Amino acid sequence: MWDTLWTDIHVATADPALISDQDGYGCIHNAAIGIENGRISWIGAARDLPDAPQNLAHKIHSGNGLWMTPGLVDAHTHVIYAGDRSLEFAERLNGVSYEEIARKGGGIISTVNATRHVSEDELFDVTARRVRRMIAEGTTTLEMKSGYGLTLQDELKQLRVARAIGTALPVRVHATFLGAHALPSEFKDRQDDYVSHLITDILPQAVEEKLIDSIDGFCENIAFTPDQIERLFIAANDLKIPVRLHSEQLSNSGGTKLAARYGALSTDHLEYVVEDDVIDLAHAGTVAMLLPGAFYFIRETRMPPVDLFRKHNVPMGLATDCNPGTSPSVSLTGIMNMACTLFRMTPEETFSAVTRIGAQALGLQNVTGSLTTGQTADMLLWDLAGPHELSYWIGGRRPVQRVFDGKLNPVI
């Protein structure tokens, strides 16, 4: 017998086999889902169940006619940090650019200083408060980056917090090493030396402690060059660790081509990519991870080329980019709305972007992100007219029930 059977539900599966021009969500109406050992054992129309529900499962839950979706996947966040940067918001409103703030010691570096000055336990506590809000908004899988430590001790501190969050809270955590996020003051004007430090000192220790699921970098004129990022990617390849990259957010610096050449799981931001870059992403099978929260918050005017991604069949993901300086957001449904209104993505595209494609961007497409047989039962029950409503509300639309790893969780 199954452990659990859900009945009286409508399901938006995000299953490519069910998605069509007429139905971009992969819907099954009047559906049922059987769960065993935390995984989906059966899904389909309730009329096709092989026996009476009471003969199939130890527990039966009724969805009372509501909508079930996959748990949401937030595949790009900087949620592990201490400190506050709300005053920078006022500076930006007065015309100070992101680059200017960064160059005078604000931006990322101010968060680095705050993060360095708290203990691991304190960092866990402030991070857990944010993550609980994300969970309440429907996130069941969460990418968490380092990059606010920039020393051996403090990068490991962030990565240990990521692992601890995944143990303490009902969320699947993908931990990303982002040591190449900014240049710390200790290495002023010595970027190459700092990259060597990342490769020879920090990365081996993080790998030894099994703290890393992927490696990221910030390739931009205020951060690191393609040549410097390539050194990091070579080290990642040697260790068989997948890579991803912040690229083409503020200018076209060549990072996207580099990421495609190394088969990156995703390249993120992408406001300044051109068609040749998009073609490279298509050939590599790399996800274009779009971050409308940052676009909105820093009042960027150049949009990522969504039409080119469609033209070349590049999968488009969405994430909150939750961070203290450019995207203080914990709501993936709010991000879905921004993607529709700012980037002209369709509601159907945004749904796939925060489920199946978000999982693909983390290399977890065979684990989570869709409601199909064999997938982990990460599921959300919503009081909606239909899945299109998820991208309609400007955030604040929360699930009424939550299933993580097959277990019914209280909505936090």
UniProtKB/Swiss-Prot annotation:
Keywords: Cytoplasm, Histidine metabolism, Hydrolase, Iron, Metal-binding, Zinc. 4-imidazolone-5-propanoate binds at R85, Y148, H181, Q249, T326. Transmembrane segments: none annotated. Its EC number is 3.5.2.7. The keyword Transport does not apply. Catalyzes the hydrolytic cleavage of the carbon-nitrogen bond in imidazolone-5-propanoate to yield N-formimidoyl-L-glutamate. It is the third step in the universal histidine degradation pathway. Pathway: Amino-acid degradation; L-histidine degradation into L-glutamate; N-formimidoyl-L-glutamate from L-histidine: step 3/3. InterPro entries: Amidohydro-rel (IPR006680), HutI (IPR005920), Metal-dep_hydrolase_composite (IPR011059), Metal_Hydrolase (IPR032466). Fe(3+) binds at H76, H78, H246, D321. GO terms for molecular function: imidazolonepropionase activity; iron ion binding; zinc ion binding. Binds 1 zinc or iron ion per subunit. PANTHER family: IMIDAZOLONEPROPIONASE, IMIDAZOLONEPROPIONASE-RELATED. Zn(2+) binds at H76, H78, H246, D321. Belongs to the metallo-dependent hydrolases superfamily. HutI family. One of its GO terms (cellular component) is cytoplasm. SUPFAM superfamilies: Composite domain of metallo-dependent hydrolases, Metallo-dependent hydrolases. N-formimidoyl-L-glutamate binds at Y148, N323, G325. It is found in: Cytoplasm. This is Imidazolonepropionase. GO terms for biological process: L-histidine catabolic process to glutamate and formamide; L-histidine catabolic process to glutamate and formate. It catalyses: 4-imidazolone-5-propanoate + H2O = N-formimidoyl-L-glutamate. Its cofactor is Zn(2+); Fe(3+). The keyword Hydrolase applies. Coiled coil: none annotated.
